[in-house]
């Protein structure tokens, strides 16, 4: 059963959009990357349920956006505190957590500061501390966001993320779509991008005690493959 559901939490820290789908006994929490600053999970329950339908029998899946109104200079650790509050509100005492890119940075802090919440952890294409590659990417995206260049951000992200064939497809798609999906404000994106550039959980990784899988790519042009290796070396018993 897909059981897609769109929801919004009214927390002490502010409102937060989330989606839920699946009917399994196990709970999986998914945390998207910095693109959440451009488009949240609001209204995406059915598309996510269809995309990840293989999970819906074993898991009840939750995907959380960052809260709607972000404070200036919020850190990934602050965002992990918001996530903990959201899980508390939904009575999710313990879950498997999958964090992708910036979502992986938030997941690291959740596992460090609230280990009772995290049963198992998957960290995909993410990092534990800044490096020159991610600083350069974020600087480019920040400059584009400041001048409202939504299409530029999407194309640059695609060119750093995909094979040449996929890049050609992305160029064609964004050429046709133009500014479809462009947010009214880039403020959330800028705050999230800054939090990626300042994220540093490296020295705390050894405090993560749950079973952990790190997924990375040797040709990663955003966070680098070395970043995944660094994480795996620091977390006890981690698999890469």
Listing of model-derived features with the role each one plays in the protein:
Residues 95, 99-104, 217:
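Conserved alpha/beta-hydrolase "nucleophile elbow" surrounding the catalytic nucleophile
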Residues 23-25, 88-94, 209-210, 237:
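Active-site acidic short loop of glycosyltransferases
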Residues 105-108, 112, 118-148, 188:
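Flexible "cap/lid" loop of the alpha/beta hydrolase fold
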Residues 8-70:
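Conserved HGGG/HGGXW glycine-rich cap/lid loop of the alpha/beta-hydrolase fold
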Residues 78-96:
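Conserved acidic catalytic loop of the alpha/beta-hydrolase fold
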């Amino acid at each position: 059963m897909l059981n897609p559901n769109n929801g919004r939490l009214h927390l002490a820290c502010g409102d937060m959009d989330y989606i839920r789908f699946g009917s399994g006994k196990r709970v999986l929490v998914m945390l998207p990357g910095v693109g959440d600053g451009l488009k949240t999970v609001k209204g995406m329950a059915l598309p996510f349920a269809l995309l990840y339908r293989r999970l819906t029998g074993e898991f009840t899946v939750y995907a959380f956006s960052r809260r709607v109104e972000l404070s200036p200079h919020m850190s990934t650790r602050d965002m992990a505190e918001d996530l903990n509050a959201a899980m508390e509100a939904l009575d999710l005492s313990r879950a498997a957590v999958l964090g992708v890119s910036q979502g992986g940075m938030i997941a690291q802090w959740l596992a460090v500061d609230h280990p009772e919440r995290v049963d198992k952890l998957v960290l995909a294409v993410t990092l534990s501390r800044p490096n020159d590659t991610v600083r350069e990417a974020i600087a480019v995206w920040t400059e584009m966001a400041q001048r409202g260049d939504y299409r530029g951000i999407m194309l640059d992200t695609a060119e750093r993320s995909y094979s040449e064939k996929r890049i050609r497809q992305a160029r064609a798609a964004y050429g046709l779509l133009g500014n479809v999906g462009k947010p009214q404000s880039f403020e959330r994106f800028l705050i999230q991008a800054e939090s990626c550039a300042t994220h540093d959980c490296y020295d705390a990784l050894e405090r993560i005690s749950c079973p952990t899988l790190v997924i990375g790519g040797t040709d990663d042009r955003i966070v680098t493959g070395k970043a995944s290796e660094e994480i795996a070396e620091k977390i006890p018993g981690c698999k890469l």
